[in-house]
């Protein structure tokens, strides 16, 4: 089955399952290929009920698909239980928190339990970050990575569930929001003063208000735009728009903010892409109709090219992707130098230990990237290929007005 045909079937299944669209499937579908691809995209659970109601699957593939969905729903229940215990612990210690993504995105799905869940990400005020972290340690949560593994969060585990406590977002911490990091951080902190309680079945949890929750989901798409985007992140945004972002809400609430942080065009293109290919309704979501359909298709092609919507990459490809990331998003000398310096401090153990070495971290990182490039099969061709891919990404990001100063 050709990739284009396979992707079209996946898109159609999602249109039917999420929005009850009428679709016509070909007769010779390789359902094993479709299932494997949807597993990789972490969306396998979404069309299962629709397929079963139409007796489309043969017994063997239906049984296999059912096992995946049963496991997924079981994990969802376990995660929601652990999330509830976390919320109770934070509440007991007078720490305001909100859930990021996860169940805060699942609330917009027709069947929230069929959205594949990953970690429990939650946000606290930076002033409460260390307090909350030490409370977690005292209550049986264990470090999954060193404390300084990331500048914006700490990762812990308990009962086989991963928790990430955030004091900001990754894309803000790495300053990939066009020098709007302070503005966005202030906006998130403002959201902590207007926490909303949401409910899925018997599970209640705190979320940001509509504006902050939507911006978090949009920033999450951008965060994964380069390293490999999954269909799940796109669908999270699409389902949010479907529930919350009609023309009036866009005009009064979102457009002024997104225009200020230079993400208006990206939101328009992404949303129109969802209308053209994934079944998002057109009625009362006309704010994205100015989008260039060719650019929508370019963006979709980019998602497909970046590892089939986030397919797990080989180590060498990941290293290549990191270099492309640097070239694509840090186009001024100052930003490029700062990225090298920040990455060098993060990766150079001696610089972490001895502060006298930190001013030279950018040199360490430059040599590190050079070594990664040369330590590959056909290094010259690989570096030229990376450069061409970077140029292609820069052109796309320019059209989308992303990563501008």
Enumerate the language-model features and the residues they cover.
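Conserved NTP-donor binding/palm subdomain of two-metal-ion nucleotidyltransferases/polymerases, i.e.
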Residues: 1-118, 124-405
């Amino acid at each position: 089955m050709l990739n284009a045909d396979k992707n079209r079937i996946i898109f159609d299944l999602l249109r039917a399952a999420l929005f009850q669209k009428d679709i016509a499937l070909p007769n010779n579908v390789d359902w094993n290929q479709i299932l494997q691809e949807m597993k990789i995209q972490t969306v396998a659970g979404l069309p299962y009920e629709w397929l079963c109601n139409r007796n489309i699957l043969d017994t063997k593939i239906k049984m296999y698909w059912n096992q995946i969905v049963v496991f997924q729903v079981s994990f969802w229940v376990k995660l929601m239980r652990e999330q509830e215990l976390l919320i109770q612990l934070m509440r007991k210690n007078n720490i305001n928190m909100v859930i990021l993504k996860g169940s805060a995105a699942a609330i917009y799905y027709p069947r929230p339990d069929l959205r594949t869940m990953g970690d429990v990400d939650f946000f606290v005020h930076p002033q409460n970050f260390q307090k909350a972290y030490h409370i977690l340690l005292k209550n049986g949560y264990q470090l999954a990575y060193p404390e300084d593994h990331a500048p914006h969060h700490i990762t812990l585990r308990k009962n086989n569930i991963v928790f990430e406590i955030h004091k900001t977002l990754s894309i803000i911490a790495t300053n990939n929001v066009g020098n709007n990091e302070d503005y966005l951080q202030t906006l998130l902190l403002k959201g902590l003063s207007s926490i909303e309680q949401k409910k899925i079945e018997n599970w209640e949890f705190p979320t940001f208000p509509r504006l902050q929750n939507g911006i978090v989901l949009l920033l999450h798409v951008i965060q994964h735009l380069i390293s490999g985007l999954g269909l799940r992140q796109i669908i999270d945004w699409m389902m949010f728009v479907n529930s919350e972002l009609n023309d009036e809400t866009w005009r009064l609430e979102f457009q002024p903010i997104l225009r200020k942080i230079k993400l208006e065009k990206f939101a328009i293109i992404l949303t129109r892409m969802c209308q053209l290919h994934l079944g998002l309704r057109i009625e009362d979501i006309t704010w994205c109709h100015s989008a260039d359909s060719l650019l929508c298709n370019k963006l979709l092609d980019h998602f497909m090219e970046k590892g089939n919507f986030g397919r797990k990459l080989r180590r060498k490809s990941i290293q290549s992707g990191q270099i492309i990331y640097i070239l694509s998003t840090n186009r001024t000398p100052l930003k490029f130098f700062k990225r090298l310096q920040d990455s060098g401090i993060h990766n150079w153990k001696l610089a972490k230990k001895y502060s006298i070495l930190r001013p030279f971290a950018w040199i360490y990182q430059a040599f590190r990237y050079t070594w990664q490039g040369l330590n590959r099969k056909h290094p010259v061709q690989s570096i030229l290929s990376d450069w061409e891919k970077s140029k292609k990404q820069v052109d796309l990001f320019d059209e989308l007005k992303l990563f501008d100063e």
